[in-house]
Design a protein with these regions (language model features):
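Acidic catalytic cores of enzymes that act on phosphate-bearing nucleotides/polynucleotides
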Residues: 122-172
Length: 172
């Protein structure tokens, strides 16, 4: 199954959880504006995380209040959409009851909540470590995307993080 996700920490952690439960065999990064403009090829059954809804999707997870208050909010869908600190937290909440092995992501999800909701201390911003540093590096507005002289593209690096997070902790 394809997972269409935003290439920030929230989207990456959401996709990693979906990969962990066996629902992800292909990753597609997308930007919200491209989703809204219809530029993303959403196929029947795709799982969408942290991005606007598309009628072809099989599951949808989002936490933005603008989506919930929108007329584009579908009446019925599979997944979870509610105002929350992160979409990763919603994916975690949705699958944890049937997949207790996901408990290994609990701390990562809590820290992703803090990063995505910008609920950080001054020290976490000025001296980021662990998940907070990863959040900064993966943020398209502040991170590695601005570096043009790297051996790997930002797109490739972000995509590799999804699988790496299923195998290693952030510190590893």
């Amino acid at each position: 199954m394809r997972v269409i996700y935003r290439g920030d920490l929230d989207g990456i952690v959401s996709a990693a959880i979906l990969m962990e439960v066996g629902l992800c065999d292909e990753l597609v990064q997308a930007h919200p504006k491209d989703m809204q403009a219809g530029k993303v090829d959403v196929q029947e059954g795709d799982i969408i995380c942290n991005l606007p809804y598309h009628s072809n999707c099989g599951m949808w997870f989002d936490h933005h209040s603008s989506v919930i208050d929108s007329s584009a909010m579908p009446e019925e869908f599979t997944g979870l959409v509610e105002v929350a600190p992160s979409a990763a937290g919603l994916v975690f909440k949705y699958f944890l009851p049937d997949h207790p092995e996901l408990s290994k992501y609990e701390q990562l999800v809590k820290e992703t909540d803090l990063v995505d909701s910008a609920d950080l201390t001054l020290d976490q911003v000025k001296n980021p470590e662990g998940t907070f540093l990863l959040g900064f590096l993966t943020d398209p507005r502040t991170g590695m995307g601005y570096q043009q002289d790297l051996n790997i593209s930002n797109f490739q690096w972000v995509s590799s993080l999804v699988e790496l997070l299923t195998k290693y902790s952030v510190e590893e």
